[in-house]
């Protein structure tokens, strides 16, 4: 088992505003809109809690933008998420990557090739792809490869997916730190609030489905993944922590892609209370017992 070996310590002052964003997934315009909405400034501590890349429209722009922010301001901290570790597959020249980027249009590697005007079909093997990336994007990929897995402060642990329930949380496997599903349904033994993304909060059972962050202070877990890109109705969340000696304050806000509309009439659904709630992908307890393939429309 590979445990977390890249842990960064952060000493926050008695008074501080901490802005935490996770699961950006290549949506550069949403990220900029969210930073503007929270009135982000250089005095804030900005923590990007993993998954800068993949699935969205411009992963390369997000990487470059956040990399620049972190180089200009020592109060910007960035963690790795599971979607950011594809750089390791590239460095190891894993042939699987060629199949991955041929099937997925919105990837960091495809963004890099597009930026260079290189057609994926002309690349003969993974070694050639690796050479192209190293020659043109070595600073970005080295930066991604060096990102820590967790950040620890006096009050908080920031990690992308979750912690194992072990006495010493630093013995958490890196795999679980980056990919653990539904951490809010589990427990941990760290005596600090653990802030995670990775698992869209709408996947957790609720009477009224919501993409807003969930703060469970009894479990000492705050989950902030708003399902951006992953969910059709998803949003990009920001957790705002006002750190103060006599007690912290917690707020959140979000941005999404949807146009603003005016509500002209209230409408109440007449539904059986027993039928309220939702089923959100992925819900592994549900398995299809019968099905068939349908042609794409």
Regions found by a protein language model. Give the residues of each.
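Active-site environment of divalent metal-dependent phosphoester hydrolases
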Residues: 25-29, 54-57, 83-87, 165, ...
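Acidic, His/Gly-enriched loop-helix segments that form or flank divalent-metal centers
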Residues: 124-222, 228-232, 244, 252-254
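Short, glycine/charged-enriched secondary-structure capping and boundary segments
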Residues: 33-37, 61-64, 92-94, 172-173, ...
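Residue-level marker for buried hydrophobic side chains located in beta-strands
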Residues: 20, 46-48, 78-79, 157, ...
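N-terminal active-site segment of His-dependent metallophosphoesterases
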Residues: 1-64, 72
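Acidic, His/Gly-rich catalytic cores of divalent-metal-dependent hydrolytic chemistry
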Residues: 196-297
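Active-site neighborhood of divalent metal-dependent phosphoester bond hydrolases
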Residues: 55-148
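Divalent metal-coordination and catalytic microenvironments
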Residues: 23, 51, 66, 81-82, ...
């Amino acid at each position: 088992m590979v445990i977390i070996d890249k842990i960064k310590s952060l000493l926050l002052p008695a008074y501080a505003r901490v802005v935490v964003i996770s699961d950006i997934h290549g949506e550069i315009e949403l990220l900029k809109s969210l930073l503007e909405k929270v009135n982000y400034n250089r005095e804030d501590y900005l923590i990007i809690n993993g998954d800068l890349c993949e699935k969205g429209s411009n992963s390369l722009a997000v990487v470059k933008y956040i990399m620049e922010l972190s180089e200009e301001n020592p109060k910007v901290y960035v963690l790795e998420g599971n979607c950011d570790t594809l750089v390791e597959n590239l460095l190891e020249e894993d042939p699987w990557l060629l199949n991955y980027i041929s099937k997925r249009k919105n990837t960091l590697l495809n963004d890099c090739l597009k930026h260079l005007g290189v057609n994926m079909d002309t690349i003969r093997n993974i070694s050639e792809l690796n050479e192209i990336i190293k020659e043109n994007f070595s600073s970005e990929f080295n930066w991604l490869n060096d990102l820590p897995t967790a950040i620890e402060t006096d009050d908080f642990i920031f990690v992308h997916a979750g912690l194992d329930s072990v006495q010493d949380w630093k013995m958490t496997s890196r795999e679980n730190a980056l990919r653990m599903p539904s951490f809010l349904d589990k427990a941990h033994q760290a005596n600090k609030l653990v802030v995670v993304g990775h698992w869209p909060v709408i996947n957790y059972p609720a009477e009224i489905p919501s993409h807003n962050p969930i703060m469970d202070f009894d479990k000492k877990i705050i989950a902030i993944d708003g399902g951006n890109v992953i969910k059709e109705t998803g949003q990009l969340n920001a957790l705002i922590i006002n750190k103060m000696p006599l007690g912290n304050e917690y707020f959140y806000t979000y941005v999404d892609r949807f146009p603003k509309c005016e509500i002209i009439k209230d409408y109440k659904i007449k539904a059986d209370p027993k039928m309220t709630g939702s089923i959100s992908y992925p819900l592994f307890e549900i398995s299809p017992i019968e099905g068939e393939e349908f042609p794409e429309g």
